[in-house]
Amino acid sequence: MGSQNSDDDSGSSGSSRSGSRSVTPQGGSAPGSQRSRRSGSGSDRSRSGSRSSRSRSGSGSPRSARSGSAESRHSQLSGSARSKRSRSAHSRRSGSARSRKSGTPESPQSHRSGSLQSRKSGSPQSRRSGSPQSRKSGSTHSRRSGSAHSRRSGSARSRKSGSAQSDRSESRSRSHSGSLKGNEESRSNSPNLQIDVERANSKSGSRSRSRSRSGSRTSRSRSKTGTPSPNRSRSGSASGSGSDVGVPKKKARKASGSDQEKKKSGSDSDIEESPTKAKKSRLIDTDSDSNQDVGKKAPAAADIFGDADDISDDEDEAGPAARKSPVRSKSRSQSKSHSHSRSMSHSRSRSRSRSRDKVESQVESAPKEDEPEPLPETRIDVEIPRISADLGKEQHFIKLPNFLSVVTHPFDPETYEDEIDEEETMDEEGRQRIKLKVSNTIRWREYMNNKGDMVRESNARFVRWSDGSMSLHLGNEIFDAYRQPLLGDHNHLFVRQGTGLQGQSVFRTKLTFRPHSTESFTHKKMTMSLADRSSKTSGIKILTQVGKDPTTDRPTQLREEEAKLRQAMRNQHKSLPKKKKPGAGEPLIGGGTSSYQHDEGSDDENAISLSAIKNRYKKGSGAGQAEVKASTIYSSDEDEGSDFEARRSKKVDKAKASKALRDSDSESDAGSAKSGHSNKSGGEGGSASGSENEGSQKSGGGSSKSASGSGSGSGSGSGSGSDND
């Protein structure tokens, strides 16, 4: 029983070192144990290390105690310096002394003494070192020791740096103890056991470590009862250590859940409030640990929560029932973890191989779909009789020119109709075909020879000359045939059979025909047709109705036009109203009209107006002179008298004539208006109009003095006005 108690003591201390921060598994409701739990994993580790050494020394293994103390010292270095040293020193002194005194039968006392001493020694130090610094500034000491260093020192440092020491210490403890107690102690020393089991399980890819971190209820109950299951003792994180505490500790934590506890332990109070919250926070811790473990895979759901067999209400059950079979529970948990890791690794490898096979099959099926399937060749077997004809040795391809044509049906003199010579006849290729009636058409017929055989004959034949050239004789016409090779096999001879064609041969040569000489009828006909098409004569237009040449009678037509214009002017002046002189109205009008017409005929010269002006200024002229003057001025018949009067006027009055010329130019516009006034005045009016410097009216006045021509005087006035106009 004593050995069992010491085992329980060492197991509980080891479990508290690996996971929980409290020392007493059952009576840890004191605040000192809570503080020591909060203060960090380093101090817990130092305590648990000293306790494990204590239990080992009690069982008679001094080397294991040495290794435990050495390991506790090493874990002190990885955590916060002050708190760890103080706690480890106190716990070492108190735990080792008490355990030695008490011995193995008094293992409960060693529990109590360890817890009490740890309360006394560890809690003040943890209060000093952990809580103030964590409150102030991010707590390089306490926070690292509480959350970060608990993970590093508990899991990473215990795996990496402390691996050699743990192996050595574990081997020593096992070799010295040589019993189940030694194995339990070495397993309860959580860094050593962690590395051992992790190495064994890392090959099979197990996640039992994270499961212990996640903190199932079984881990709490088993660590509480002191069962050193490797799954639970393997974890060295703060969250795992917080979870490896019994039910009484939960109550104490809820009661004294301060801010320090939240900051350091990573929401341990929330974890104990509800199992689901605890699982979530433990999952977070396991995630942070898995980040540190490079190459480790994420934990599966089965590894985190375990199977239905692992989940049990061990918290409600009593501790002694579990204490009776520590070895059985240990082996069962180990086998379960190994089997889980194997099954998970097998299932993962299977799923990976399946996914790879699927990807490969998809990649292989993709190019197969892209390749189009070749269509099967369709063949139809048809029986067609073969046509074989003796085509001779040579076959030539002939493109008939426009001066040659072929009649395919046999010639019959009874049904033969002479061709109509139409020059616009077109062949099948749209060319104008030259019709030579019989001379350029190849015909054939069948006749019976003397032997009674039907023989074919034609009006055309080929003649081969000695130099190799050929010529075509068609009736009376001779055409030279030229042979040319055909490039390619594009021209074939086919025979029509039903709706299909049957090939007979391939044309290799081509024949072209040209007239033999320029004197042949075909050549002449060709040249004539070409001449008709090429000659373009400019057409001459013939006018059937032609009139007189308008340019021949141009002078006479001009004279006629001038006469017409003069007559029109006279008609205009006739229509003007005229005032008659009393007693001499009729002769004035009659004389005026006759003299007006005469005057218009002789207006080519300016002598008429000049002489009238000169006669106006004559003084004392006789009546005979006035008659001659009037007749000479307005008559074209008496040229001599007019000349005589002009000479006399020049001699008599040269100065007055020059003055009258200047005045007539300035006052020519009022001539016609004042002619009636001069007619009224009579003989005296002549002198009055003379004073007004109007030549036409004065000459009218002079004529009115003579008893013969008062009418002519009025006419002279109007005539001079029109002349000035």
From Swiss-Prot:
Keywords: Phosphoprotein. This is Another transcription unit protein. Residues 104-116 have a biased composition (Polar residues). The modification Phosphoserine is found at residues 175, 186, 188, 190, 265, 267, 269, 288, 290, 312, 355, 595, 602, 631, 635-636, 642. GO terms for cellular component: Cdc73/Paf1 complex; nucleus. One of its GO terms (molecular function) is RNA polymerase II C-terminal domain phosphoserine binding. GO terms for biological process: positive regulation of transcription elongation by RNA polymerase II; regulation of hemocyte proliferation; transcription elongation by RNA polymerase II. Residues 82-101, 141-160, 206-223, 325-353, 571-582 have a biased composition (Basic residues). Residues 11-70, 117-140, 224-242 have a biased composition (Low complexity). Residues 1-10, 306-318 have a biased composition (Acidic residues). The modification Phosphothreonine is found at residues 286, 593, 632. Residues 354-369, 644-665 have a biased composition (Basic and acidic residues). Residues 710-725 have a biased composition (Gly residues). Residues 1-379, 566-603, 617-725 are annotated as: Disordered.
